[in-house]
UniProtKB/Swiss-Prot annotation:
Oligomer status and interactors: The Tat system comprises two distinct complexes: a TatABC complex, containing multiple copies of TatA, TatB and TatC subunits, and a separate TatA complex, containing only TatA subunits. Substrates initially bind to the TatABC complex, which probably triggers association of the separate TatA complex to form the active translocon.
Function: Part of the twin-arginine translocation (Tat) system that transports large folded proteins containing a characteristic twin-arginine motif in their signal peptide across membranes. TatA could form the protein-conducting channel of the Tat system.
PANTHER family, alphabetized: SEC-INDEPENDENT PROTEIN TRANSLOCASE PROTEIN TATA
Ranges for region Disordered: 43-76
Membrane topology, record value: Single-pass membrane protein
Protein's cellular compartments: Cell inner membrane
Transmembrane intervals: 1-21
UniProt name for this protein: Sec-independent protein translocase protein TatA
UniProt similarity note: Belongs to the TatA/E family.
């Protein structure tokens, strides 16, 4: 009894359609769809400059570098 069945949802949908009208609901659907599309486009635009702005690596790595510890530096 705690869950809503398909009949409950159909009755709620019918009441919403009667209160707002199908034209108003269609406009809300179009507005929501365009908002989602705009959000996705904005996310794509935000990703492109981040990839282009990667800084080139500079410097070199010494492959013969020796790892020193604190006790090694105290001995010298």
């Amino acid at each position: 009894m705690g869950g809503l069945s398909i009949w409950h949802w159909l009755i709620v949908l019918l009441i919403v359609a009667l209160v707002f009208g199908t034209k108003k609901l269609r406009n809300i659907g179009n507005d929501l769809g365009s908002a989602v599309k705009g959000f996705k486009d904005g996310m794509k635009e935000g990703e492109a400059p981040a990839d282009a702005q990667q800084l080139p690596r500079s410097g070199s790595v010494d492959v013969n570098a020796k790892e020193t510890t604190r006790s090694d530096s105290n001995k010298a």
